[in-house]
UniProtKB/Swiss-Prot annotation:
Pfam families: Glyco_hydro_1
EC number: 3.2.1.21
Gene (name only): BGLU14
Active site: E199, E396
Full protein name: Beta-glucosidase 14
Signal peptide: 1-21
C-alpha cells in the first residue's frame, strides 16, 4: 500500500510540474470560461450554523444544541446557534444573495431533528420541517440555482444520543437510513445531488478524540474537560457506523429512487495533503500513514470495502472494527461522486509509536506540522490516481478572519486565497481530474462551532448585533465579476 502511495506521489509531481512549466510564475487572472462549460460554482452552509429557529415549528434538539447551551464554556465566546443567521426566516434573502453574486448552486444541509424531532420514525415526522426545506428548494430553483443537499452535517438528534449513544450505537445505521429515505422521498424530485455525510473525519477526531466538538467525548488525559469517552476506541466505532450509515443511505436511494429521480449521491470528505517533513524514508512512510488515517480512512472502504492497510497494521488490540462480507459488498462503489473539503496542507514527520495514552491521534505514529500551499491540486490528483478517477466536487474551500466587532467588507486575503485555489483546481482539471464544481465556504458569516462567532468565513458579512443584516464583502463582488465573465486576479 505504501508503494502505491509513492507511485501516486510521483504521478502528482510529474503532472503538476508539466502544468506549472507551461505557466508564468505569477498567478494568471481567472475567467469563468477557463473552466469547463458545465462547471458548477456555488456556496455552502450548514443547518445548525445558519438556520437558527432552534425551538420553532417542532424541531427537536441536536447534540449541538445541548453541547453549546449546556456547556457554554466549551464555545470560545460562550455562544450557540439558537438564532445563528436566522436563515430559517431569511432564506429568501439568502437565495437572493446567491443569485446576485451569480452562483448556480447552493450546498445546504438538512437538520435531522427538524425532520425527525426524536431522530427516528417512532417519534414522528415533522411536517413543518418538510415544508421549510420544500420552500427553500423551490426558491432556489426559481432563481436557477441547483440544490446540493447534505443529509448529515454533525447535528445528531439528542434523543438518539440519549437512547444509545448516537453514532456510538449500531442502531443509528438504520435510523439514519430511514431519515435519508424521508429526505429522498420528500425532496428528490427536485434535488439531484445528495451528500450523505459531511466530514466524518471531523466528527470522529473532534467529537471523540479531542473532545472539543459535540458530543465532547475524549480520554481524560487528552482533555480534562471531557465528562466521558475513550479516544482509543470510540472514534473507530463511530467512524465505522458513519461509513455503514452512508452505505445504507445510498443503497436505499439506488433501490427505491434512482430510476425515477435520476439523482446522484456522494459524500464530503475532508483532509489536508501531507508531504514528508524531510526526504527520509521514515518521514515518507509517515506521510503515507497520515493520508491513510485521514482521507483514505473513509475513501478506501467505499472503493475496496476495506480499511486502509496502514490502519489495519497500526491500530492495535482489536480496536479497529471489521466489515462483514455483506457490508463490504454494500460499500464497494457506494458513491456517484466524492466531495472534497479542503482548507490547508501540512508536513508529516515520523515519531515513535506510543504505548501509553494511546488515541486515534497517536496511532499513525506521525506528527503533522506546519502549513503549505498547493495542496488542493495534489489532493485532487491523489484521489484521481489512487481511487479510480472519481467524479469530484470541491464541496468546501475558504478561509476565516477574526471578528473585530466592526463591519469590515474588505477581505483581500480571502480573494487571494480563492484565486490561488481556483487556479490549482483548474490545473488539476487540465491534468485530467474529473472535477465538476467548486463551493465556497461560506456564503454567510455564521456560528463556527467551538469558535462561536469569533471568526468569519462568509462572502457575506452578517451583523449579529443588528437584526442579522447582510452586506456583500469584497470577495462576493470578486466572485460576481468572475462569474459574469470578467477577468479577476
Amino acid at each position: 500500500m505504501t508503494s502505491k502511495y509513492f507511485s501516486v506521489l510521483v504521478f502528482i509531481i510529474l503532472a503538476s510540474n508539466e502544468v506549472v512549466a507551461k505557466r508564468h510564475s505569477s498567478t494568471p487572472k481567472l475567467r469563468k470560461t477557463d473552466f469547463p462549460e458545465d462547471f458548477i460554482f456555488g456556496a455552502a452552509t450548514s443547518a445548525y450554523q445558519v438556520e437558527g429557529a432552534a425551538q420553532e415549528d417542532g424541531r427537536g434538539p441536536s447534540i449541538w444544541d445541548t453541547f453549546s447551551e449546556k456547556y457554554p464554556e466549551k464555545i470560545k465566546d460562550g455562544s450557540n446557534g439558537s438564532i445563528a443567521d436566522d436563515s430559517y426566516h431569511l432564506y429568501k434573502e439568502d437565495v437572493g444573495l446567491l443569485h446576485q453574486i451569480g452562483f448556480n448552486a447552493y450546498r445546504f444541509s438538512i437538520s435531522w431533528s427538524r425532520i425527525l424531532p426524536r431522530g427516528n420514525l417512532k417519534g414522528g415526522i415533522n411536517q413543518a420541517g418538510i415544508d421549510y426545506y420544500n420552500n427553500l428548494i423551490n426558491e432556489l430553483l426559481s432563481k436557477g440555482i441547483k440544490p446540493f443537499a447534505t443529509i448529515f452535517h454533525w447535528d445528531t438528534p439528542q434523543d438518539l444520543e440519549d437512547a444509545y449513544g448516537g453514532f456510538r450505537g449500531a442502531e443509528i445505521v438504520n435510523d439514519f437510513r430511514d431519515y435519508a429515505d424521508i429526505c429522498f422521498k420528500s425532496f428528490g424530485d427536485r434535488v439531484k445531488h445528495w451528500i450523505t455525510l459531511n466530514e466524518p473525519l471531523t466528527v470522529v477526531q473532534q467529537g471523540y478524540v479531542a473532545g472539543v466538538m459535540a458530543p465532547g467525548r475524549c480520554s481524560k488525559f487528552t482533555n480534562p474537560n471531557c465528562t466521558a469517552g475513550n479516544g482509543a476506541t470510540e472514534p473507530y466505532i463511530v467512524g465505522h457506523n458513519l461509513i455503514l450509515a452512508h452505505g445504507e443511505a445510498i443503497k436505499v436511494y439506488r433501490k427505491k429512487y434512482k430510476a425515477s429521480q435520476k439523482g446522484q449521491v456522494g459524500i464530503a470528505l475532508n483532509a489536508g495533503w501531507n508531504l514528508p517533513y524531510t526526504e527520509s524514508a521514515e518521514d515518507r512512510l509517515a506521510a503515507a500513514r497520515a493520508m491513510a488515517f485521514t482521507f483514505d480512512y473513509f475513501m478506501e472502504p467505499l472503493v475496496t470495502g476495506k480499511y486502509p492497510v496502514d490502519m489495519v497494521n497500526n491500530v492495535k488490540g482489536g480496536r479497529l472494527p471489521t466489515f462483514t462480507s455483506k457490508q463490504s459488498n454494500m460499500l464497494k462503489g457506494s458513491y456517484d461522486f466524492i466531495g472534497i473539503n479542503y482548507y490547508s496542507s501540512s508536513y508529516a514527520k515520523d515519531v515513535p509509536c506510543s504505548s501509553e495514552n494511546v488515541t486515534m491521534f497517536s496511532d499513525p505514529c506521525a506528527s503533522v506540522t506546519g502549513e503549505r500551499d498547493g495542496g488542493i491540486r495534489d489532493l485532487i490528483l491523489y484521489a484521481k490516481y489512487k481511487f479510480k478517477d472519481p467524479v469530484m466536487y470541491i464541496t468546501e474551500n475558504g478561509r476565516d478572519e477574526a471578528s473585530t466587532g466592526k463591519i469590515l467588507l474588505k477581505d483581500g486575503d480571502r480573494i487571494d486565497y480563492y484565486a490561488r485555489h481556483l487556479k490549482m483546481v483548474q490545473d488539476a482539471i487540465l491534468i485530467g481530474a474529473n472535477v465538476k464544481g467548486f463551493f465556497a465556504w461560506s456564503l454567510l458569516d455564521n456560528f463556527e462551532w467551538a469558535s462561536g462567532y469569533t471568526v468569519r468565513f462568509g462572502l457575506v458579512y452578517v451583523d449579529f448585533n443588528d437584526r442579522r443584516k447582510r452586506y456583500l464583502k469584497k470577495s462576493a463582488h470578486w466572485f460576481r465579476h468572475l462569474l459574469n465573465g470578467k477577468k479577476e486576479n
